[in-house]
Amino acid sequence: MKVIFLADVKGKGKKGEIKEVPTGYAQNFLIKKNLAKEATAQAVGELRGKQKSEEKAHAEMIAEGKAIKAQLEAEETVVEFVEKVGPDGRTFGSITNKKIAEELQKQFGIKIDKRHIQVQAPIRAVGLIDVPVKIYQDITSVINLRVKEG
């Protein structure tokens, strides 16, 4: 019996695969536990349509990620922060992922999730700082920050 796997089944198949399995195994285990469904013409058509829409969405995300990367790597894209500085040359407050994401949105209209900004430790120094950011899967870039004394 041909089935479409709805979830990964160790040793049998991965989600989205169409495979031939013994009829009893399919009916009594895979289908009952919602791990697979019978591969009818309609079900196969739905699977193909779903895979095409996922590929299209993935391609759109890659294109959007590359556009954001180009914006971030432009020479004029430098996120400016004006912070109060103590006598030791360190800022009173620290600059976090959240602050960087908000300023990027406010100053340049570039929306990046704060969880994708990869700051090792909160920034407390004054000057030019490069912060790595993971835009989408394997698309990475650098945000240029300028922290000024205010």
UniProtKB/Swiss-Prot annotation:
Gene Ontology cellular component annotations, sorted alphabetically: ribonucleoprotein complex; ribosome
UniProt KW Repeat keyword: no
GO molecular function, one term: rRNA binding
Keywords: Ribonucleoprotein, Ribosomal protein, RNA-binding, rRNA-binding
Top-level division of the source organism's lineage: Bacteria
Cystines in this chain: none
GO biological process: translation
InterPro entries the record matches: Ribosomal_bL9, Ribosomal_bL9/RNase_H1_N, Ribosomal_bL9_bac/chp, Ribosomal_bL9_C, Ribosomal_bL9_C_sf, Ribosomal_bL9_N, Ribosomal_bL9_N_sf
Family under the similarity heading: Belongs to the bacterial ribosomal protein bL9 family.
Function: Binds to the 23S rRNA.
Protein's UniProt name: Large ribosomal subunit protein bL9
Organism: Streptococcus pneumoniae serotype 4 (strain ATCC BAA-334 / TIGR4)
Name of the encoding gene: rplI
